[in-house]
Amino acid sequence: MSAPTTTDPVARARDAAARESWAEAYELLHDHDRHPERGLTADDLSVLADSAWWAGHIDESVTARLRAHAAYLAADDHRGAGLTSWWLYYEYAGLGRPAAAAGWLHRARHHLEDLPDCPEQCFLAMTAAEEASARGDHESALAASRRMTALALACGSPDLLALGRQAESRVLLAAGRRTEGIALLDEAMCAVSAGELSGMVTGWLYCLALTQCMEAADFARAVEWTNAAMEWCAPPWTGSPPDGNADTAAPATGTAPATEDTPAAMTPLPMTVPSGENPFRGVCRAHRVEVLDLLGAWALAEAEARQACREVPVDCLESAAAAYYAAGDVQRRQGRLEAAAVSYGHAHELGRIPQPGLALLRLAQGRADAAVAGVDLALACRSDPDHDVLGRARLLAARTEVALAVRDLPGAARAAAELDALAGAADGGVPLLRALADTALGSVALAERRPGALLPLRRALAGWLELRVPYEAAQVRMLLAAACRAAGDEEAARLELGTARAVFERLGAVPDARRAAALLSGGSRRRLPGGLTTREAEVLRLVASGGTNKDIAGALVISEHTVARHLNNIFAKLGVGSRTSATAYAYAHDLV
């Protein structure tokens, strides 16, 4: 498209906005608006508000939109005033000002509800669907979303039609109608990938779709749309990322262990969007962090989390909270417990309940009671899984793990059974939920010493491998090794342990790698010297490797009190009085 020939800055700004060259439009209108004698129309003020938002000036966007509303009212344009009111509702809600948001939503309804059918009413219908869905009134939510779609079809707007399909998809997913919901989401995303939509709606739909995919535990779609979203967000965010952009590279499948160069913890960062950047970039990157975490690209996930928190606009702080939480999960599994605690704390400050990660951190620290209380409270706060199936599934998986750690077999069995029911209720089957459920069922069967543990564990391993989720697959291999060893198949146990250890070492999951190494060393002999039990031998090996009681508790997922009790028993059985003497015994008897 050739450059505009007019010298009128407002006309040039309108042309720039039509081309979605928002930085140019903002600069022209911002400069023009500095002179009070040069008035802007209501439409021009709306363009200034939009361009200020894209340029990262949220407060200026709100101010311009307030002026636009007044100008529409002065012109007796209720459609313009109604749409502007709705956008003010949306912006104030994102800024954490619910009272102001509610007032502007009421104004939007006042302006639009009594008018004949018009495109602006689509936004009221979308909000009505969200409110009804939040109440659990799926019937009303579905009716509202379908009204939005009907209005969009009547006015011929691709933007509104795609938003209507997405809104209906979300309602259907919440109602448990997964197959229908996913089909509508795919239809909406076709319009996105084909470049049929405006930049605002494209970014909006990417963010909504990524959230829906993860909440619905549809990992394959989450990976696909995350990669597409990051390509679209890449400068100059016209749909074609520049060559060599690191953000568009295929995710790595593994990472090196944490080193001294790795930051100990993620510190709070200013969350502002640099002028000219895509405001959706940080939000999409935050979603990417969760995908990279599952894929085992931990170093990249942590780096991306840090970058996301720099890019997330101030009206999307929940995305920064999600990035901090994901970084905490990486740090916890790598044994960087203090750094994980800091990251979970930042997530909590930004409004996210940092569970189940915080409960698993407390378990690794030997604070089993705090772990139980944390995950139980989080489950009580999420009694309705409709809007976040994966979130509840992860809590139930953690509840199973924590219960087994404190030898609460009935509690573990209940959590695993609920997780199994959740996976079974998913329309069409969900591989990620099924793998979580099979892992929990197998771990409970193993703890109860039931012969049927191998079957669900084999299913779980196959599921995680198919999803290409390495850490969880390696964890299942540890359980399979225990089941094989209990069945007398030492060779199979050692194969599983060796593979698990290699994965843990590649990921930098230090505590798990140590645990696998200890179990490998212990499997070569049937009778342990000194009358030691298998667990006592594991503790002794970790003592000999220089581990503190805290290190040993984290590696074996037991409390420090239990470690101390094991050490007392070891000292008594071996007739030694110090860790040094116990270490010497371990080396003398080939226990290390």
Give, region by region, the residue ranges found by the protein language model:
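Helix-turn-helix DNA-binding segment
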Residues: 518-521, 525-577, 581-592
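Tandem amphipathic alpha-helical repeat scaffolds
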Residues: 12-18, 43-56, 82-98, 120-137, ...
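Inter-helical turn/loop elements of alpha-helical hairpins
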Residues: 1-123, 127-146, 159, 170-183, ...
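Internal metal/ion-chelating core segments
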Residues: 149-244, 263-313
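Actinobacteria-biased recognition of intrinsically disordered, low-complexity terminal regions
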Residues: 1-8, 238-267, 526-530, 592
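Amphipathic alpha-helical segments of tetratricopeptide repeats
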Residues: 26-34, 66-76, 106-116, 146-156, ...
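TPR-adjacent "capping" and linker segments in tetratricopeptide-repeat scaffold/adaptor proteins
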Residues: 1-8, 345-347, 386, 425-433, ...
